[in-house]
Amino acid sequence: YPCKLNLKLGKVPFH
């Protein structure tokens, strides 16, 4: 998943 989506999900941002 994109960083932005991970931030929304509350997970660690993956680049």
Curated annotation (Swiss-Prot):
It comes from the Eukaryota. GO terms for biological process: apoptotic process; defense response to bacterium; defense response to fungus; killing of cells of another organism. Induction: Up-regulated by infection with E.coli. Keywords: Antibiotic, Antimicrobial, Apoptosis, Fungicide. Antimicrobial peptide which displays antifungal activity and antibacterial activity against a wide range of Gram-positive and Gram-negative bacteria. Has antibacterial activity against the Gram-positive bacteria E.faecium ATCC 19434 (MIC=2.5 uM), E.faecalis ATCC29212 (MIC=2.5 uM), S.epidermidis KCTC 1917 (MIC=5 uM), S.mutans KCTC 3065 (MIC=5 uM), and the Gram-negative bacteria E.coli BW25113 (MIC=5 uM), P.aeruginosa ATCC 27853 (MIC=10 uM), S.typhimurium KCTC 1926 (MIC=5 uM) and S.enteritidis ATCC 13076 (MIC=5 uM). This is Periplanetasin-2. It comes from Periplaneta americana.
